[in-house]
């Protein structure tokens, strides 16, 4: 595997571990120093392909292959236009065709295949579906807001749980110190034997530990269905697909041999007399004597009637 490096100044990460590689829309890599040198005015051409680039569009290379970074950025731009969802299509087949079209566009733009026709196709689609694109953008914005709100609620719950646990630990320490101090005071002032005082102290410590270990009731945050309290759910009807139902057809296998008895008949016909009975451990793993015997008979009978042609 070739060591990563800048193709212009030939600096590699082996010689400079702090080397920061940058990539732009064309997918060619430059180090941060070369970017600052070549794009002093804020814009310039790629030294490899000559594509006009802006300095502000350079970003840190995340993947070893810069083509992957290029594809990620192209996919983001394409999905901003082709943002339809499954519920926008009357059938699953049309939705799958739409996804295949998106993948074809991303592939063409990433690998510089038929760029003019691909870009023209995107412009036509954007003009014809302007309203749908805007509606899905607003829908996506609402979903992002709901997601951020849910994350914020979860963060607050985690913070409250952390503070509650911290408070409980502090309370436990205080109670233990009080119990210890009470025991020392009794040793100083009481006339009872030390063994009796020690036994009483152990009893109180045990009761205190049991009280502290008793689980506190947790306030429910979700319903029994798994839906979080306060969460708004969509009640829109689900699109029904009018398709033919699946019909099971038994598997027909030509074994060129005698007919093998059914599983239920093996015991009556005496096939299981000399087969090891299944133990409880075998049954737990899915093994049954009749199934093993049935498989063995299939192997034994297979090909007995076969004749070379």
Swiss-Prot record:
SMART domains: RING (SM00184). A zinc finger (RING-type) spans 6-50. GO terms for cellular component: CAK-ERCC2 complex; cyclin-dependent protein kinase holoenzyme complex; nucleoplasm; transcription factor TFIIH core complex; transcription factor TFIIH holo complex; transcription factor TFIIK complex. It is found in: Nucleus. The keyword Ribonucleoprotein does not apply. Signal peptide: none annotated. Keywords: Acetylation, Cell cycle, Metal-binding, Nucleus, Phosphoprotein, Transcription, Transcription regulation, Zinc, Zinc-finger. Residues 142-161 form the UIM domain. The modification N-acetylmethionine is found at residue 1. One of its GO terms (biological process) is G1/S transition of mitotic cell cycle. Stabilizes the cyclin H-CDK7 complex to form a functional CDK-activating kinase (CAK) enzymatic complex. CAK activates the cyclin-associated kinases CDK1, CDK2, CDK4 and CDK6 by threonine phosphorylation. CAK complexed to the core-TFIIH basal transcription factor activates RNA polymerase II by serine phosphorylation of the repetitive C-terminal domain (CTD) of its large subunit (POLR2A), allowing its escape from the promoter and elongation of the transcripts. Involved in cell cycle control and in RNA transcription by RNA polymerase II. NCBIfam families: cdk7. This is CDK-activating kinase assembly factor MAT1. It comes from Homo sapiens (Human). The lineage of its organism: Eukaryota, Metazoa, Chordata, Craniata, Vertebrata.
